[in-house]
């Protein structure tokens, strides 16, 4: 058995670290199989040496987050514990130091995981970035945040967001109403990110000036998109032909981010995903990056990680090795 004590700088810091009703400490006890005793600003752990060491590292990581004004939400604490188990809690500072943007309500945006940080670095460095991962990893929201930042910095003159309207088979002419009414239901997730980052009023003004364009993928055909930050969301639902069409729209001074989840393909049976195809065909092209986010990067409710993991395992069990090659290569 080993024992370690930690004296925090103040009662206020201790209260924030411990959480409401010592919630965070109870999580640490369960995760690392240690016993914790809290007295004032002092915290004492007892248990197996490696477990006590990991628990102390987790507290160090939480202190780092608090010093950088990062709220200790449940998922943040769980990620901190995950890094502490591998002795990487010091890398949390890399996340808090990586500033992306500020929302319309003044909330600063930082990557919440090391995978997200890698994704942002790839977007900054490359003309084309593929962000592939399950729901909840922030791949679309962070891409939109980077687009808004580039627009505000005048690195680009417009933002273009698109996704395949696969639910309507992209045959939007058969739907009632004008174009905007037809496509809004399929593009709503993209609007949500823009509203959060810009505010509804600013978004509307930029939209009316055509500085922001949100449109289904079918409406990209035949265009050259210069000086723009272009995001293709839900790319797993493109065909190889659609993906090639989209990527070749890129013009001078533009940056492209393609996001998707290869476990959520809604294409007709036996139709190959354009995302899987592109990941394979373009893997060695300079200036094109591929970042794989995993369940470790999920920043929603803790159950989402377990749900994602279960579905991925089921998909791998059902998928022939040849079809899965583009998904499994270069996994982080």
Language-model regions, residue ranges each:
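Short, surface-exposed acidic/glycine-rich loop or hinge patches that mediate macromolecular interfaces
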Residues: 11, 22, 49-50, 237, ...
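Conserved helicase motor core of SF1/SF2 NTP-dependent helicases
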Residues: 42, 104-114, 122-232, 236-332
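Hydrophobic side chains in well-ordered alpha-helices
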Residues: 17, 55-58, 243-246
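Proteins enriched for Cys/Gly/acidic motifs involved in redox and nucleic-acid/cofactor modification
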Residues: 78-112, 117, 124
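Short glycine-/aliphatic-rich beta-strand segments at the starts of folded cytosolic domains
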Residues: 1-16
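Interdomain "pre-motor" coupling segment immediately N-terminal to P-loop NTPase/helicase cores
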Residues: 37-96
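Short amphipathic alpha-helix segments
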Residues: 13-30
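A short, structured beta-strand/loop element
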Residues: 29-37
């Amino acid at each position: 058995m080993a024992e370690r004590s930690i004296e925090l700088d103040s009662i206020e810091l201790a209260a924030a670290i411990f959480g409401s009703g010592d919630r965070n400490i109870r999580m640490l006890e369960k995760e690392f199989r240690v016993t914790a005793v809290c007295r004032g600003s002092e915290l004492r752990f007892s248990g197996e040496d490696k477990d006590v060491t990991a628990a102390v590292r987790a507290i160090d990581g939480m202190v780092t987050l608090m010093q950088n004004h990062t709220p200790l939400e449940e998922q943040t604490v769980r990620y901190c514990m995950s890094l502490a188990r591998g002795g990487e809690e010091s890398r949390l500072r890399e996340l808090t130091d990586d500033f992306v943007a500020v929302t319309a309500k003044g909330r600063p945006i930082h990557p919440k995981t090391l995978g997200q940080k890698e994704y942002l670095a790839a977007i900054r460095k490359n003309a084309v970035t593929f962000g592939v991962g399950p729901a909840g990893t922030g791949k679309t929201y962070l891409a939109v945040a980077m687009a808004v930042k580039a627009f505000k910095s005048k690195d680009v003159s417009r933002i273009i967001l698109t996704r395949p309207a696969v639910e309507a088979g992209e045959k939007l002419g058969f739907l009632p109403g004008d174009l905007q009414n037809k496509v809004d239901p399929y593009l709503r997730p993209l609007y949500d990110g823009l509203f959060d980052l810009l505010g509804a009023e600013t978004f509307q003004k930029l939209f009316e000036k055509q500085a922001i364009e949100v449109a289904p993928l079918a409406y990209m055909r035949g265009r050259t998109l210069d000086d723009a930050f272009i995001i293709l969301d839900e790319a797993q639902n493109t065909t190889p032909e659609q993906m090639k069409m989209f990527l070749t729209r890129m013009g001078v001074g533009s940056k492209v981010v393609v996001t998707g989840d290869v476990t959520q393909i809604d294409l007709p049976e036996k139709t190959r995903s354009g995302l899987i195809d592109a990941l394979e065909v373009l893997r060695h092209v300079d200036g094109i990056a591929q970042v794989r986010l995993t369940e470790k990067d999920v920043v929603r409710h803790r159950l989402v990680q377990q749900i994602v993991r279960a579905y991925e395992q089921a998909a791998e069990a059902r998928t022939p090795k040849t079809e899965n090659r583009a998904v499994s290569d270069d996994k982080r």
